[in-house]
Amino acid sequence: MYRMCLWMLLTSALSSELAAASADESQVMTSVGHYHGVIDATGVRSFRGIRYAESPAGGHRWQPPRPVKKLSGMTSAMDYGPACLQPKRAASTALRTDEDCLFLNVWTPASATRERLPVMVWIHGGGFLTGDGRIPGEVLATHGVVVVSMNYRLGPLGFMAHETLKSNIANFGLLDLVAALDWVQENIAVFGGDPNNVTLFGVSAGGQAVNMLMVNPQAAGKFHRAIAQSGYSTWALPRTSDAPKPAPLSADMRKADSAESISMHVLSRAYPNATSLPPLREVEGQRLVDAVEGFQLPIVDGSSLPEEPARLFLRGKQAKVPFMTGGNSFEGSVMPQSGISVDRFARMLGESLSTIESLYASDFAISRDIGIQRVFGDTRYLVSARMLATAMRTVDAPAWLYYVDLAPEQLLPRMVGTPHAFDQLMLFGSDRIINESTRRTSERLRRYWVEFARSGQPGVPELTSWATCCINQDQWMVFGVNDDVRSGMLSDKLDVLTELYQKRWATVH
């Protein structure tokens, strides 16, 4: 609910700008046909609702994405395509959804017809269960980059393990993202983008997707930099029965269920009598996504995702590209939506709880819930960020860590720090919903992100110099009222939480 409210604030605040856009047509010829979009009031050309793969509905449910067929005539790219199906309890009633949903969007400066501008490919979050590619991409495009966003299959339509599937692929949503990158490689030049300078970036599940693409062989060479914002790649994922290595312990220290058993539980809730694929492909897709409890998890299937990203990073299996990652000061704000209670997570901490309470004394002094939520957020997101950034040394690639520490009193007065996904609002937000100090910080953050996409280094001459993170000790760029780089920040806390993670894996490996 919090993520939905944050996104509604963002989209409603920007609606008047989008409505004021001019209707000047802008045409482009892609590999499959002609499209026409619009040039808006900011001087940005936008193309919305471009199909990057054929419909995955009906008999193509739980199949890899298929290439787009050639189009005849001129196709309108003025409106977003439908979002992928998602639970009714979480989606806005105004959101148009359909199982036929594999569409992407492009924003590019109007002057960039023959240029080769950096390309920034945004992957939305939403727990792999909600969300879509509707963003105000013109906000970043005005900085001289080409922005791409896309929909990808969600919930059990995007992540499904079933014993009768002929392939060992379970992450169809991840394959959708690879297909979108294929489309970028083939077509982005006609929009003024450089196919040899593509940056992935995404928040939350989108950040996790970035990390998964970093270790996906099918995505190799299709992007050249990556920014994972609040990715959570250290937590255990369900495994298929034929995936290598046994299933690790889950977050509450119980043996994780197999991916097949989790998938069958969802399927039985949607259609109790179906045990084979043909009838399941005929079940209304909305029933399937409505049957998911909590978030959707990607699946370790030995193919599209060989193992948890953190384990692969530590073994040097990730792409050798410049990498930025980090999170916010109160990531634990997302805990109520995670499906893990305060008491359950406290039990997971076990004998370390007293040490952790001492390290987080100021948070526990406010309340036990605030203390546990802060620890949860740091464990889930910041431990992952530091571990993956440090592991980039195994492939001799540079990495940078960031930490947003703003108290957005004007927007969310009851937050004790910067909430989960607030950096998305900073990247794409509006002056009317954040105060002047936060607006200035947001503009600086955008400039660092764009420069990283342009050059592979987040260095802006007139702003604070940002050193790589892990040569001698942790170096975090802290975005606040005044930005600064801090060495060893959070090390005492993250060292303890990382040790817990290592013990959890050592019990089963």
Regions from the PLM with identified roles:
Residues 86-274, 312-335, 397, 456, ...:
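Serine-hydrolase-like catalytic core of hydrolytic proteins
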Residues 238, 273-439, 448, 455:
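Substrate-gating cap/lid region and adjacent catalytic-acid/histidine neighborhood
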Residues 139-141, 215-219, 413-419, 468-469:
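Short glycine-biased active-site loop of nucleotidyltransferases that positions the nucleotide triphosphate
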Residues 153-155, 201-205, 403-410, 464-470:
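Short, solvent-exposed turn/loop segments enriched in Gly/Ser/Thr/Pro and often Arg
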Residues 20-171, 195, 435-448, 454-465, ...:
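Non-catalytic accessory segments of hydrolases
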Residues 158, 224-225, 232-234, 420-435, ...:
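Substrate-binding rim/cap in mid-to-C-terminal beta-strand-loop elements of soluble/periplasmic
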Residues 283-285, 407, 456-483:
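Polar, surface-exposed loop/tail segments
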Residues 5-16:
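Bacterial N-terminal signal peptides
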